Regions:
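Short, Lys/Arg-enriched N-terminal segments with co-localized hydrophobic residues
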Residues: 1-4
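Interfacial aromatic "cap" segments that immediately flank transmembrane helices
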Residues: 6-32, 63-89, 125-176, 202, ...
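Short, small/hydrophobic-residue-rich motifs at membrane-helix boundaries and re-entrant hairpins
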Residues: 10-14, 26-59, 67-121
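Selective recognition of hydrophobic, aromatic-rich stretches within alpha-helical transmembrane segments
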Residues: 31-54, 103-142, 174-211
Length: 213
């Protein structure tokens, strides 16, 4: 239990370890210029996961702009899109159905909120395992392997459950602190990305303190 608590706490502190200034400056810029910065940002998230797998004691890696960064970002973006697509296709029909009782605008807002929860659950099942495997192997098939991610969750549910809790908490804390400190949403988003990368890396490490195997 102590190891698990330490690992979780380490994920939350990891974004500030070692070279934080340059890493954060470029990361904040990438978030600020979204959607233009989407591919570099997602590519860096993969690179951060890879770094946390290889040297978990170090901080986030330096930004290295390369073809691999953009390619990794493109594969990660495609994986997110594939998890989102079924719910995007359901959004308008559900909004029309709810429109029988609500104003069309509020009906579509309600539909989006109703679909956000199952999409978030699917993303939590797929993205941590897929990202950790893709970061380790570099094989795009790992990034898109939803069935493999689901098997990973079933095989090591305790580890996935703790990692998912870290990711959800990081996004909640990041956005809440950004609002509370009046610094805007940009730092909170980048902080959550870094914490998520470090947490996902725990699923790939050979010596898994979180594993039940």
């Amino acid at each position: 239990m102590v190891c698990r608590v330490t690992r979780i706490a380490d994920s939350f502190a990891w974004p500030f370890r070692n070279r934080p200034a340059a890493t954060w400056a470029i990361g904040l810029l990438a978030v600020l210029v979204l959607p233009v910065g989407l591919l570099p940002l997602l590519g860096y998230a993969v690179a951060a996961t890879r770094a946390a797998e290889q040297t978990p004691g170090d901080g986030p890696p330096r930004w290295t702009f390369s073809a691999r960064l953009l390619a990794d970002g493109a594969w990660a973006a495609l994986a997110v899109l594939l998890t989102l697509l079924p719910f995007a296709l359901l959004w308008h029909p559900l909004g029309m159905l709810l429109g029988a009782a609500l104003d069309p605008f509020y009906a579509h807002v309600t539909a989006a909120l109703l679909l956000a929860l199952p999409w978030g659950m699917l993303a939590l099942v797929h993205m941590p395992h897929a990202t950790s495997r893709f970061a380790a192997t570099g094989d795009p098939r790992d990034m898109l392997d939803l069935a493999g991610a689901a098997r990973g969750v079933r095989r090591d549910f305790q580890a996935w459950n703790l990692v998912a809790a870290v990711i959800v908490t990081a996004w909640a804390v990041g956005l809440a602190c950004a609002a509370a400190l009046c610094v805007g949403i940009v730092p909170g988003v980048f902080y959550a990305i870094l914490v998520s990368a470090h947490a996902a890396a725990a699923l790939q490490r050979p010596n898994k303190d979180l594993s039940t195997r």
